[in-house]
């Protein structure tokens, strides 16, 4: 072999070695990248499952507590609804009837609250039921008006088996605040206004009473959705005023 041929061979071998090293490094980086993506996906999935598990666990615990509460009161006024109801602070009673806050975080018109409540009551008399639902239908689910009406109508039919006095509360407006952008508010308020326009006639058809919400200050929430102290001042008044018709019939 000539000297030049030997030198060329050595150079080629060195170049091949460097290319092999680069290829190996690229493959390692690719593997690391895929591993990071996989870990990220698993972490996101675990976080979602964990949050869902916590939410389900909270609801189950709360439903058990409500079972205990409703089993020891007679002829109560029950407020059913979502986290807006659950976070509310209402008087303990109204004209001699215990007020039971039966709000469940995340509840909507598809949560089958009627079946759950009828089962818990097990035939016990109820003075009145106030229903406050619709925010979660408008936000996460983005249900159409026909879907919302059908779900709400079915719920009222179930609740009417427990009492002749069912009060349907209007859905509170949302603010453009924090994570709730102006575009998100506009889209959600379109559905909320549509729902609210359907509730008076829907209540009448179902033998229920519609309770409107007076105008709220701006802002009236702490995060765009959940009510602030100022928001609850208006909301509480509407709930109590709607249920107070019961007091005149005693």
Where in this protein do the model-derived segments appear?
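Conserved beta-strand elements of the Class I
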Residues: 78-80, 100, 129
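Active-site metal-binding loops of divalent metal-dependent hydrolases
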Residues: 83, 104, 135
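Flexible, active-site-adjacent loop/turn segments at secondary-structure boundaries
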Residues: 82, 102, 220
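A short beta-strand-loop structural module common to alpha/beta enzyme folds
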Residues: 98-111
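Short active-site-adjacent helix-start/loop capping segments
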Residues: 87-88, 108-110, 137-140
């Amino acid at each position: 072999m000539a000297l030049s041929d030997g030198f060329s061979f050595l150079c080629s071998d060195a170049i091949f070695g460097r290319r092999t090293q680069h290829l190996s490094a690229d493959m390692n980086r690719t593997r690391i990248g895929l591993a990071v993506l996989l870990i990220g996906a698993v972490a996101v999935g675990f976080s979602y499952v964990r949050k869902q598990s916590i939410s389900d666990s909270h609801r189950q615990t709360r439903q058990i507590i409500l079972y205990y509460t409703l089993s020891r009161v007679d002829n109560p006024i029950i407020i059913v609804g979502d986290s807006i109801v659950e976070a509310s602070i209402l008087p303990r009673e109204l004209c001699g009837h215990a007020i039971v806050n039966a709000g469940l975080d995340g509840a909507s018109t598809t949560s089958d609250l009627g079946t759950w409540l009828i089962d818990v009551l097990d035939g016990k008399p109820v003075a009145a039921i106030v229903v406050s639902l619709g925010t979660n239908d408008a936000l996460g689910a983005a249900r159409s008006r026909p879907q919302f009406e059908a779900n709400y109508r079915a719920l009222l039919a179930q609740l009417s088996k427990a009492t002749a006095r069912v009060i349907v509360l209007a859905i509170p407006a949302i603010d453009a605040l924090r994570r709730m952008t102006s575009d998100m508010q506009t889209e959600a308020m379109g559905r909320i206004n549509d729902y609210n326009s359907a509730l008076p006639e829907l209540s009448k058809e179902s033998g229920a009473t519609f309770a409107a919400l007076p105008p709220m200050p701006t802002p009236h929430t702490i995060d765009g959705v959940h009510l602030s102290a100022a928001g609850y001042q208006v909301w509480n008044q509407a709930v109590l005023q709607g249920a107070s018709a019961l007091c005149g019939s005693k």
